[in-house]
């Protein structure tokens, strides 16, 4: 892997991790079209660190408040809307953990094909469009009860199917439940913190036990590039989502999915 490849892959990861357009659909393009080799475990860990740092730093005030409220509810029995939201994020994380443990091998063996990614990119794009057009868009994230959190968590678990998009699935579920676009996006981004942490930790453990060589320059490129691109992406998405809605992302997903099918049929 060259520094240019490291930069491009980290940029793709940072830009697509938090937009409802599927990072997996984009990350297969360099290897499928340009023949780039797999970037390896170490680089995967690096871009997870970068994107995690971006969302934690962007929502640093909320993260500190939610952690404090969560611990206060555990050790002092205090109840607050912040503690409730923190517990809803915990509940929403559980389905993905279970699904990942049970279905990891099935996904890796049977569902990582370009045809699956193209199909899910289109189908979940259309679902996002339908929900965005018909949702009530009234509630904020603090109104989520455990049933809503579990529903969104199941959507996050299904997003492990390549091409679905974690942010796309969770935002779609939140919109369906009546969240405003901004609240759906914020809840999705806050939900990403524990799941990216767990995924990155799992990859880090695999890296340590694999003995794979580590190239510090590539890792720094991955961390810095994914951090900057993800941070800017979160900021711009939250600023623009209320007035532009989800239609631009739906159109992009349809073009991407059709383009992938066209490439596969001509290859």
UniProtKB/Swiss-Prot annotation:
GO cellular component, one term: plasma membrane
Compartments, as annotated in UniProt: Cell inner membrane
Residue stretches in coiled coil: none
KW Transmembrane helix (keyword) present: yes
GO MF term list: undecaprenyl-diphosphatase activity
Topology in the lipid bilayer: Multi-pass membrane protein
Family: Belongs to the UppP family.
Name of the protein: Undecaprenyl-diphosphatase
Organism: Vibrio vulnificus (strain YJ016)
Source taxonomy: Bacteria, Pseudomonadati, Pseudomonadota, Gammaproteobacteria, Vibrionales
């Amino acid at each position: 892997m060259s520094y240019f490849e490291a930069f491009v892959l980290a940029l793709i990861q940072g830009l697509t991790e938090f937009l409802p357009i599927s990072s997996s659909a984009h990350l297969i393009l360099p290897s499928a079209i340009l023949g780039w080799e797999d970037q390896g475990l170490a680089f995967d860990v690096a871009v997870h660190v970068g994107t995690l740092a971006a969302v934690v730093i962007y929502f640093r005030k909320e993260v500190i408040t939610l952690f404090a409220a969560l611990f206060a509810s555990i050790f002092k029995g205090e109840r607050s809307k912040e503690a409730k939201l923190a517990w809803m994020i915990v509940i929403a994380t559980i389905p993905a953990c279970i699904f990942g443990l049970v279905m990891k091998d099935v996904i890796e063996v049977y569902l990582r094909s370009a045809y699956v990614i193209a199909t899910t990119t289109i189908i979940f794009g259309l679902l996002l469009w339908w929900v965005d057009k018909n949702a009530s868009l009234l509630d904020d994230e603090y109104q989520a009860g455990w049933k809503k959190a579990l529903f969104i968590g199941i959507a996050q678990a299904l997003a492990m199917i390549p091409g679905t998009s974690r942010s796309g699935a969770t935002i779609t579920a939140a919109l369906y439940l009546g969240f405003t676009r901004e609240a759906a996006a914020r809840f999705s981004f806050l939900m990403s913190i524990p799941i990216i942490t767990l995924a990155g930790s799992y990859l880090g453990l695999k890296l340590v036990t694999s003995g794979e060589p580590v190239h510090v320059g590539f890792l720094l490129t991955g961390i810095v590039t994914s951090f900057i691109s993800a941070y800017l992406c979160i900021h711009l998405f939250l600023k623009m989502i209320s007035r532009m809605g989800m239609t631009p992302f739906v159109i992009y997903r349809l073009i991407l999915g059709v383009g992938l099918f066209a490439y596969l049929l001509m290859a």
